[in-house]
Amino acid sequence: MKKRASVRKICQKCRLTRRRGRIRVICSNPRHKKRQG
């Protein structure tokens, strides 16, 4: 999981979700996992 200042979708399977006030990217590819803040 990487922490980024800005998160966006990398591929078609990436999904942006909000958990506990943080924006996360969930994807079938583990390399695409990241959160904001």
From Swiss-Prot:
Q: Name the predominant localization.
A: plastid
Q: Which InterPro entries match?
A: Ribosomal_bL36, Ribosomal_bL36_sp
Q: Has UniProt tagged this entry with the keyword Ribosomal protein?
A: yes
> What is a single molecular function from GO for this protein?
structural constituent of ribosome
- Read off the Pfam families from this record: Ribosomal_L36 (PF00444)
Subcellular location as annotated: Plastid, Chloroplast
An example Gene Ontology biological process = translation
Would you say which domain of life the source belongs to? Eukaryota
The chain's disulfide connectivity reads none
Q: Which UniProt keywords apply?
A: Chloroplast, Plastid, Ribonucleoprotein, Ribosomal protein
What GO cellular-component annotations does this UniProt entry give? chloroplast; ribonucleoprotein complex; ribosome
Q: Which family does it belong to?
A: Belongs to the bacterial ribosomal protein bL36 family.
Under the heading HAMAP family, the entry gives:
Ribosomal_bL36
Official protein name in the record? Large ribosomal subunit protein bL36c
Gene label: rpl36
